Amino acid sequence: MERLMSDGYPFIFQLIDKSESDDYLIQTLQYRFKSDKSHHAYIVRVECYKKHAYCVKFFDKANINSKNKFSLRSNTFEARTILYTMFHIMLDVLKRDEKASFFFIGAEDEKDQDGMVSRRFRLYRRFVLSTVSDDKFEHFRRNDLSLYILVNKEYVEDTASYADELAGIVQRLMH
């Protein structure tokens, strides 16, 4: 499952932000990295939910104050390297919590059509299918939510029910 770090940018773990006001969210792990190519800095937020479910999100630090920061495109044409960096951050989370399962949502941008799978989701899906084997994680997709779920098969007995429950939580949080 592991790849060389040369496939992504070096990253730094910054902080743990505890949540006490949310029914589902426990804490958020924050990482950062900087692109050697574009010199853009990125913030990665890994939200830890109940039952060891982690949502991986990232944005260009230049957009930190935008309410649409997760939807804005940086147009640096380095998606592959950024996604490998996300993959390595997921491995770091897995070292911290061996029971971790992951999910991410392909945020819509201005070129996406309502009701259709987002372009980001399609990119994430292709990347994950080619990078994460199904030995350790079972892959689930919810096209209607542009949601991709990786369920840790070693620690979750009923992976389909877990994925359905997680999709339900995501759906409630989105609306």
Features from the language model and the residues they span:
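Non-catalytic substrate-recognition and accessory regions of acyl/acetyltransferase enzymes
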Residues: 1-175
